[in-house]
């Protein structure tokens, strides 16, 4: 468990359950993805999974993931379905990652990767403060060509709860970083221009409807 010297009750809760935690660390970090990297470096098992402090696993999450690991030993990673406030985020269509309008397949809460495969991809790029997970997925799928699978839509392994880190980020900052990540990974400039216009129009459409 990695804590960035939280100012809430996180450390108190960690200490309360320390006998049930194999390892915990509380020190200043350089943002969410720096904490992810620390956890990945310390991970001892064959698979790595990450969950943010505001999110939760479903009661049968690990049974579902274990089933897919057992049936698909050659898969490098698994995208598990994640419940969000608007519906369920699910599926895996690798060809769509380059040109998808929105962000990609799973949330970090539903993502599991073999430790050996994670070493091939490297760490999360902490220069990206909001969407380093998309950059990670892009490198993993397009550049390293790792093989993955997804659980069925109704096999939900995690719940993304509003009010966490990503819920407090201004849309403009998220939008700019999304385009930067796509550009840095060599995506088509014409497509990025079209995507930018689409995102802006969609943003103002939602504003007007509200």
Label the model's feature ranges.
Residues 48:
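Short aromatic/hydrophobic "clamp" motif used to bind/position activated sugar donors
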Residues 3-12, 52-55:
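A conserved acidic beta->alpha catalytic loop
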Residues 10-13, 26-43:
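Glycine-rich, basic loop-to-helix element that forms the pyrophosphate-binding segment
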Residues 9-10, 36, 57-64, 74, ...:
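Acidic donor-diphosphate engagement hotspot in glycosyltransferases and nucleotidyltransferases
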Residues 91-177:
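Conserved nucleotide-sugar donor-binding catalytic segment
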Residues 1-5, 25-26:
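Short beta-strand/loop segment that forms part of the nucleotide-sugar
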Residues 56, 60-91:
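Conserved donor NDP-sugar-binding/catalytic core segment of glycosyltransferases
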Residues 32, 51, 56-61, 84, ...:
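Hydrophobic/aromatic residue at the end of a short beta strand that borders the catalytic acidic motif
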């Amino acid at each position: 468990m990695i804590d960035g010297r939280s100012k809430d009750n996180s450390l108190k809760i960690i200490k309360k359950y320390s006998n049930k935690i194999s390892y915990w660390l509380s020190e200043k970090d350089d943002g969410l993805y720096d904490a992810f990297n620390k956890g990945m470096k310390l991970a001892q098992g064959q698979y790595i999974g990450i969950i943010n402090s505001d999110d939760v696993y479903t009661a049968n999450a690990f049974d579902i993931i274990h089933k897919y690991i057992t049936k698909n030993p050659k898969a490098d990673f698994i995208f598990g379905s994640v419940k969000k406030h608007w519906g369920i985020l699910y599926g895996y269509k690798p060809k769509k990652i380059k040109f998808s309008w929105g962000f990609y397949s799973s949330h970090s809460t539903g993502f599991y990767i073999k430790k050996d495969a994670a070493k091939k991809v490297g760490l999360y790029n902490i220069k990206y403060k909001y969407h380093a997970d998309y950059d990670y997925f892009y490198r993993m799928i397009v550049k390293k060509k790792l093989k993955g699978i997804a659980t069925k839509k109704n096999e939900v392994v995690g719940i993304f709860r509003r009010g966490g880190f990503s819920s407090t980020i201004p849309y403009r900052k998220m939008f700019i970083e999304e385009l930067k990540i796509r550009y840095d990974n060599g995506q088509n400039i014409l497509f990025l221009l079209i995507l930018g216009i689409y995102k802006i129009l969609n943003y103002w459409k939602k504003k007007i409807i509200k």
